[in-house]
C-alpha cells in the first residue's frame, strides 16, 4: 500500500500508525507527485481516495489519461460530481467528464454517503464512485481527436452540434458520421463521439 498525504502535520502520525506494516507514506500533493516514481514498485494499482471536492474531477481525468498503472479507482466525491462522472447519454447529468471517463473506463455510483458521517457536517451529500479502466478504449479513435470535440460541444451545450462544432466539423462531416446535426451533445453516446472524431 502506498498512501499520498499532503497534510504535513498528519504525515508523521500516519507513519507512526502504519509502522511495521507494508505501507509507505508519500508526503505530497496528488496533483503534483511523479506518479511514475510513486507507483514504480508494481505494474498495476487500485486507487482508493477521499478527494477534496474542488480538485476531484481534474485529478480523476488526469490519472485516467496519464497513469495507466491505475487500473481501478474507488473515490469519494460530492454526490453531484459522482452523478456526472458516471452519467451516460441521454442522462441530463452528462457532460465533459462523463464522456472522458467513459473513454477510459466504466464508472458507477456504488454508494451514497450522508453529511452526518462527517465532522463538521458538509452541506452536501457525498458518493462513492468506482471506475474500472478499459483494457482498450471502446472507440477506435485517439483522445486527442475526441476531447476537443466534446469540450467544444459541451461548452455550448444548449446549442445544436452543427453550431457548437462549426469550427471543427462541417454539417456534411457530422451527417457522414451518422449523427444528426441538430442533436445536442447530451444525446450523443461515446460511439457517436468516436465517429465524429474520425469524420
Describe each region flagged by the PLM.
Residues 1-149, 195:
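Catalytic cores of RNA-modifying enzymes
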Residues 31-32, 78, 156, 173, ...:
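Residue-identity detector for glutamine
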Residues 37, 166, 175, 194, ...:
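SAM-dependent transferase fold signal centered on methyltransferase-like domains
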Residues 47, 185-188:
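Phosphate-binding beta-loop-alpha motif at adenosine-nucleotide cofactor sites
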Residues 73, 182-184:
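Residue-level marker of motif borders
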Residues 88, 100, 149, 153, ...:
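Residues that form generic nucleotide/phosphate-binding pockets
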Residues 124-127, 131-133, 138-172, 180, ...:
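An accessory alpha-helical subdomain
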Amino acid at each position: 500500500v502506498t498512501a499520498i498525504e499532503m497534510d504535513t502535520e498528519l504525515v508523521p502520525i500516519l507513519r507512526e500508525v502504519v509502522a511495521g506494516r507494508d505501507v509507505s507514506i508519500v508526503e505530497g500533493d496528488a496533483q503534483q507527485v511523479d506518479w511514475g516514481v510513486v507507483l514504480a514498485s508494481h505494474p498495476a494499482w487500485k486507487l482508493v481516495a477521499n478527494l477534496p471536492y474542488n480538485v476531484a474531477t481534474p485529478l480523476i481525468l488526469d490519472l485516467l489519461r496519464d497513469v495507466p498503472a491505475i487500473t481501478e479507482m474507488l473515490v469519494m466525491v460530492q454526490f453531484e460530481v459522482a452523478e456526472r462522472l458516471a452519467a451516460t447519454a441521454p442522462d441530463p447529468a452528462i457532460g465533459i467528464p462523463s464522456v472522458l471517463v467513459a473513454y477510459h473506463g466504466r464508472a458507477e455510483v456504488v454508494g451514497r454517503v450522508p453529511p452526518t458521517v462527517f465532522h463538521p457536517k458538509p452541506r452536501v451529500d457525498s458518493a462513492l464512485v468506482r471506475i474500472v479502466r478499459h483494457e482498450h478504449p471502446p472507440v477506435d479513435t485517439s483522445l486527442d481527436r475526441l476531447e476537443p470535440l466534446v469540450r467544444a460541444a459541451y461548452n455550448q451545450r444548449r446549442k445544436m452540434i452543427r453550431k457548437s462544432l462549426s469550427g471543427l466539423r462541417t454539417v456534411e462531416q457530422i451527417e457522414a458520421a451518422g449523427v444528426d446535426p441538430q442533436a445536442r451533445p447530451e444525446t450523443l453516446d461515446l460511439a457517436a463521439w468516436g465517429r465524429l472524431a474520425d469524420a
